[in-house]
Amino acid sequence: MIFGHIAQPNPCRLPAAIEKALDFLRATDFNALEPGVVEIDGKNIYTQIIDLTTREAVVNRPEVHRRYIDIQFLAWGEEKIGIAIDTGNNKVSESLLEQRNIIFYHDSEHESFIEMIPGSYAIFFPQDVHRPGCIMQTASEIRKIVVKVALTALN
């Protein structure tokens, strides 16, 4: 996992596909876009613009992805995201790996939380369990941008 703020320069060189995704986040006015999917580089890099209300962590299920990495960016609002390394000991709640490239767990072993504010981003790789959309202080309306980068696009 990589955690940062879009206003800060990248501390090191990242794969070109991730740099392209971060450049898109820096250059886009998300207030001007409706929720939905925007392709950046076909199915190699695309984004989901999502408006939601944060919920208690116990209501949200931890998740992992196997074919894409997630770059989760907060445009407005505030949220916590649960994070952990996938130890292989988490009980599967629902597997939609073939249909949607997602596995949900009942819970997440050794979970910590990061706090997201507008401009924050977190990059989740296949071994990173994450539980997005959790309340920080109180329920909050947020706009979250999730950029999906195909593992095959990394070089």
Curated annotation (Swiss-Prot):
Span of the signal peptide: none
GO cellular component, one term: cytosol
Paired cysteines (S-S): none
Any single Pfam family the record assigns to this protein: DUF386
Superkingdom of origin organism: Bacteria
Gene3D superfamilies: YhcH/YjgK/YiaL
Coiled-coil spans in chain: none
GO biological process, one term: response to radiation
Family named by the database record: Belongs to the TabA/YiaL family.
Name the record gives this protein: Protein YiaL
Organism of provenance: Escherichia coli (strain K12)
